[in-house]
Curated annotation (Swiss-Prot):
It comes from Escherichia coli (strain K12). This is LPS-assembly lipoprotein LptE. Residues 174-186 have a biased composition (Low complexity). GO terms for molecular function: lipopolysaccharide binding. The lineage of its organism: Bacteria, Pseudomonadati, Pseudomonadota, Gammaproteobacteria, Enterobacterales. GO terms for biological process: Gram-negative-bacterium-type cell outer membrane assembly; lipopolysaccharide transport.
Length: 193
């Protein structure tokens, strides 16, 4: 019986490991990005904290921005904008529901390579009850905090695609340098009369 239980447990572990299953909210960050610099205009702001938390959850070691190492990729957080649009209205014309749209722009700088822009958009809606102003403000603050967390998750999920784009550009660069034959220098056919 013990042998059968061990066999079934081992089989379950192999199946989940073999199919690529991984824990929720974790991304397989490329090995070249396991050490990174997080650069932000507001290092203690909500987006910086959310991104720092997501990077640490995914096993990325963060270095100070002032580090002397220049061979480390850096994630530079850019502009964050939050727009609030009316989604529905009451009969009297007052806003009943808002849709909030958060747009986050960032760039990943890979030293000696290129700069890769990434962005994330998060949509949330919430009801506007004019009779509960304080509760509405608290709910909106909670929604904005959750939006920062979701935007950070989206940015971190895009890191593997940046690595793939970097590899693809390397392959294109090597194929163009090795496949094209050398052309002779251009000779002018006109005489300087």
């Amino acid at each position: 019986m013990r042998y059968l239980a061990t066999l079934l447990l081992s089989l379950a572990v192999l199946i989940t490991a073999g199919c690529g299953w991984h824990l929720r909210d974790t991304t397989q960050v490329p090995s070249t990005m396991k050490v990174m610099i997080l650069d932000s205009g507001d290092p203690n702001g909500p987006l910086s904290r959310a991104v720092r938390n997501q990077l640490r959850l995914n096993g990325v070691e963060l270095l100070d921005k002032e580090t002397t190492r220049k061979d480390v990729p850096s994630l530079r957080l850019g502009k964050v904008s939050i727009a609030k649009d009316t989604a529905s209205v009451f009969r009297n014309g007052q806003t009943a529901e808002y849709q909030m749209i958060m747009t986050v722009n960032a760039t990943v700088l890979i030293p000696g390579r290129d700069i890769y822009p990434i962005s994330a958009k998060v949509f949330r809606s919430f009801f506007d009850n004019p009779q509960m102003a304080l509760a509405k403000d608290n709910e909106q603050d909670m929604i904005v905090k959750e939006m920062y967390d979701r935007a950070a998750e989206q940015l971190i999920r895009k890191l593997p695609s940046i690595r793939a784009a970097d590899i693809r550009s390397d392959e294109e660069q090597t194929s163009t340098t090795t496949d094209t034959p050398a052309t002779p220098a251009r000779v002018s056919t006109t005489l300087g009369n």
